């Protein structure tokens, strides 16, 4: 199982562990260790502790650098959405981690690999193990592959109102006329999609799509704000 995991990590993420035992530890639950006491195995809780701290740090640093004018309160809410149990469990599933977790027989029968709490732990423990094995840069590369693209995909749009955030940013030094214009709508009434552009003083600064005008406006505002922050 760990051999297959190592092969997957190499193929998908270019990650090769120097210490295979550390990788195995990150994917081993206590129930498995208890059933294999003759093998002197370790389980994931200690590296999970480290991974939790590493993830909060790298996500905090990324948000601080990317959103240079975002207030602390909004940064905190966005970070909380990115480093929560639900998000980490989702990332673990997208990485196909569940099938590689070593569980005791009882936990296997209970389908423990489906629990968000366990998948969150495994995601954190993997990052902790990667940090111990190779340091900060490989961790940054991994989260740039797995976590940060979700910002541009709109995964965390529900955390705050991008239209308000964009307005506050554009008008911080004075009045700016902000307008949202419908470019195109497509599809039948029950499946209609909308393309909307956002303009600042008549100049297009972003565009977005959605299944409602409100969703498309939020998408356009998010794209515009992200692009402005990167200038």
From Swiss-Prot:
| Classification via InterPro entries | dsRBD_dom, RNase_III, RNase_III_dom, RNase_III_sf
Sorted keywords for this record are: Cytoplasm, Endonuclease, Hydrolase, Magnesium, Metal-binding, mRNA processing, Nuclease, RNA-binding, rRNA processing, rRNA-binding, tRNA processing
Q: What is its EC number?
A: 3.1.26.3
* Biological process according to GO: mRNA processing; regulation of gene expression; rRNA processing; tRNA processing
Residue positions annotated to bind Mg(2+) are: 48, 121, 124
The active site annotation covers 52, 124
Q: Name one GO molecular function term.
A: double-stranded RNA binding
Stored Pfam families: dsrm (PF00035), Ribonucleas_3_3 (PF14622)
Per UniProt, the ranges with Polar residues bias are: 220-231
Q: Which residues form the DRBM domain?
A: 161-230
Q: What SMART domains does this protein map onto?
A: DSRM, RIBOc
- Output the superkingdom of the source species: Bacteria
Where found in the cell?
Cytoplasm
**Cofactor(s) required, per the database record:** Mg(2+)
Q: Which HAMAP family match?
A: RNase_III
Q: What is this protein for, i.e. what is its function?
A: Digests double-stranded RNA. Involved in the processing of primary rRNA transcript to yield the immediate precursors to the large and small rRNAs (23S and 16S). Processes some mRNAs, and tRNAs when they are encoded in the rRNA operon. Processes pre-crRNA and tracrRNA of type II CRISPR loci if present in the organism.
Query: Per its UniProt record, what NCBIfam families does this chain match?
Result: RNaseIII
PANTHER family according to UniProt: RIBONUCLEASE 3, RIBONUCLEASE III
Family the entry assigns = Belongs to the ribonuclease III family.
Q: What is this protein called?
A: Ribonuclease 3
**Source species:** Lactiplantibacillus plantarum (strain ATCC BAA-793 / NCIMB 8826 / WCFS1) (Lactobacillus plantarum)
Q: What is the lineage of its organism?
A: Bacteria, Bacillati, Bacillota, Bacilli, Lactobacillales
